[in-house]
Amino acid sequence: MSDQVMPTGQNPALQIRNLDFFYGDFKGLKNVNLDIAQKKVTAFIGPSGCGKSTLLRTFNRMYDLYPGQRAEGEILFHGKNLLEKSQDVNLVRAKIGMVFQKPTPFPMTIYENIAFGVRLYQRMSGSAMDDRVEWALKKAALWGEVKDKLNQSGLSLSGGQQQRLCIARAVAVKPEIVLLDEPTSALDPISTAKIEELINELKSDYTIAIVTHNMQQAARISDYTAFMYLGELIEFNETGTIFMRPGKKQTEDYITGRFG
């Protein structure tokens, strides 16, 4: 079924072609094909275990951290296949940043949470680093809340602030793509609303791919939505079409709560 899903848009940020993914001998993704549009929000929805987070983690090869996992096919980024072993995965992850389900600030100051990643890829003066930290925190709509306590621990922040700190950390290295794996599932409604507002602002500068279990969230913030089930991409289209005029019965059943 997945091989029938055509890519959308022109000059995509990522092109996924004939992608399979394996956990040992188990096939977790089956022939996934789609394009991720530049400077748009693409949401991945589907029941638990459908492969949406697995797919997201292939985009910057996070699976390399786990023995026995492998991907086959192509993920094209500027015309080069990210799955080739010759790719420098550290550079891939600099260009394709990731924010996880639970806030994961480093056990260091707010300032160092931002500066640490930047130093891995760039040499700059102290004043330039100060500017980069401020820039990243402003991008994550956090500067006004933390500018007077940059030397305090990132762990001292609230859950919602910690997640925005993680977003600031991701954008500080100036990626092209930001991956968000259920970034609000551990947050309260007010913090969730702030993250959603932030995502809407960030897409003017970054391509964003988000996994969410919250269909209303996907409908609110995304331009494109992909519905996945049992490792297959069942349907992919503009978000309004997916939610108002789905082309597949499985999609309709899922978004109307009749799935199963």
UniProtKB/Swiss-Prot annotation:
| Gene Ontology terms: cellular component | plasma membrane
Kindly list the residue ranges recorded as spanning the membrane: none
Q: How does it sit in the membrane?
A: Peripheral membrane protein
Identify the PROSITE patterns for this entry: ABC_TRANSPORTER_1, ABC_TRANSPORTER_2, PSTB
Entry keywords, A to Z:
ATP-binding, Cell inner membrane, Cell membrane, Membrane, Nucleotide-binding, Phosphate transport, Translocase, Transport
Disulfide bridge positions per record: none
Q: What is its EC number?
A: 7.3.2.1
GO terms in the biological process aspect are:
phosphate ion transmembrane transport
Q: Where in the cell is it found?
A: Cell inner membrane
InterPro entries linked to this entry: AAA+_ATPase, ABC_transporter-like_ATP-bd, ABC_transporter-like_CS, P-loop_NTPase, PstB-like
Domain (ABC transporter): give its ranges.
14-255
PANTHER family membership: ABC TRANSPORTER I FAMILY MEMBER 17, PHOSPHATE IMPORT ATP-BINDING PROTEIN PSTB
Q: Which NCBIfam families match?
A: 3a0107s01c2
Annotated protein name in UniProt: Phosphate import ATP-binding protein PstB
Q: Specify the species.
A: Thiobacillus denitrificans (strain ATCC 25259 / T1)
